């Protein structure tokens, strides 16, 4: 002990790299819950899950809501595969995929990724927080990895964990174990596809954030990619009468096509090759734009 200054001696103890970047990842995943507005936003993103939960309980007779004829039909007869209402039948894997892939889910995923993923690095740069490179002794690659893991955990709680919880609820509400036996394999493939596609989507968002000068600019670019790409794809598909163009141009459509193709679900009018090319091209482009701005020299500038 140094008496005049009351300093304590400390010895250098090396720690694994994961011990240095993992706290940053968990902090990023919990960032949204640090304000009331963030908690409200996350609650809004759970609306598709809550709606599907109500449908699930109606089908299995826990709730008596809606017209009696509809309840009877849902409870007694599985909906024909490929029919207009096939994704309302919890005895099919498509019911759980729709919770994360249908158009209403897009609005909430867009909000969530815009406020968290697309701002992750740009927000740190605006507050000079890239000094984490030397205060936590992490490399730029580890910093980006931490941001990606944190963002993926948060978005994945909606796109992956929520469908899984919904399926578990259906398994325990079902009168026997038939639902488990008939959907377990399909659900495993669906969850794998959701994990892969969610990871790619959040990686693109993280790189967009890394390339942007400001957090607001990152949100604008990210929204333009998802919404603008979808609008252009819809226009060209209608004019040229080529519905598969949506898979090549619209990132959200490509997200759904990748998941459905891995899960073995119906993806009519879609191109799996186009979907992979769309997401892969965006991933490479955003990485190329971000790589120079994430160097240590940039953090010192």
Regions found by a protein language model. Name each.
Residues 96-123:
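Long, hydrophobic alpha-helical segments
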Residues 17-19, 26-44:
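Membrane-interface helix starts
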Residues 120-152:
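Helix-loop-helix units of permease transmembrane domains in multi-pass membrane transporters
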Residues 36-63, 107-114, 222-232:
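Hydrophobic alpha-helical transmembrane segments of multi-pass membrane transport/permease proteins
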Residues 9-12, 72, 89-105, 145-206, ...:
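Secretory targeting signals
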Residues 1-25:
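Short, membrane-interfacial amphipathic segments enriched in basic
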Residues 110-117, 165, 203-207, 286, ...:
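Hydrophobic/aromatic residues in alpha-helical transmembrane segments
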Residues 2, 11, 58-96, 216-296, ...:
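Terminal transmembrane helical anchor/hairpin motif
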């Amino acid at each position: 002990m140094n008496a005049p200054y009351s300093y304590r001696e400390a010895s250098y103890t090396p720690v694994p790299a994961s011990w240095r970047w993992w706290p940053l990842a968990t902090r990023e995943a919990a960032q949204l819950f640090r304000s009331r507005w963030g908690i409200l936003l996350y609650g809004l993103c759970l609306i598709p899950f809550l709606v599907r939960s109500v449908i699930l309980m109606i089908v299995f007779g826990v709730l008596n809501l809606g017209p009696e004829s509809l309840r009877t039909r849902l409870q007694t007869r599985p909906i024909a595969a490929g029919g207009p209402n096939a994704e309302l039948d919890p005895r099919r894997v498509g019911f759980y995929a729709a919770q994360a892939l249908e158009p209403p889910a897009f609005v909430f995923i867009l909000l969530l990724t815009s406020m968290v993923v697309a701002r992750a690095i740009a927000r740190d740069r605006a507050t000079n927080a890239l000094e984490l490179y030397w205060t936590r002794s992490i490399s730029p690659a580890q910093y980006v990895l931490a941001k990606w893991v944190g963002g993926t955990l948060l978005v994945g709680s909606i796109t992956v964990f929520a469908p899984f919880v919904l399926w578990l609820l259906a398994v325990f509400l079902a009168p026997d174990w038939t639902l488990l036996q008939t959907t377990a394999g399909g659900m495993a493939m669906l969850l794998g596809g959701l994990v892969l596609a969610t990871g790619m989507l959040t990686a693109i968002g993280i790189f967009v954030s890394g390339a942007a000068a400001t957090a607001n600019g990152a949100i604008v670019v990210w929204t333009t990619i998802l919404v603008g790409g979808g609008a252009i794809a819809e226009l060209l598909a209608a004019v040229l009468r080529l519905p598969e163009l949506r898979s090549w141009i619209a990132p959200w459509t490509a997200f759904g096509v990748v998941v459905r193709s891995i899960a073995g679900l119906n993806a009519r009018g879609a191109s799996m090759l186009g979907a992979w090319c769309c997401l892969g091209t965006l991933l490479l482009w955003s990485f190329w734009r971000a790589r120079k701005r994430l160097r240590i020299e940039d953090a010192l500038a």
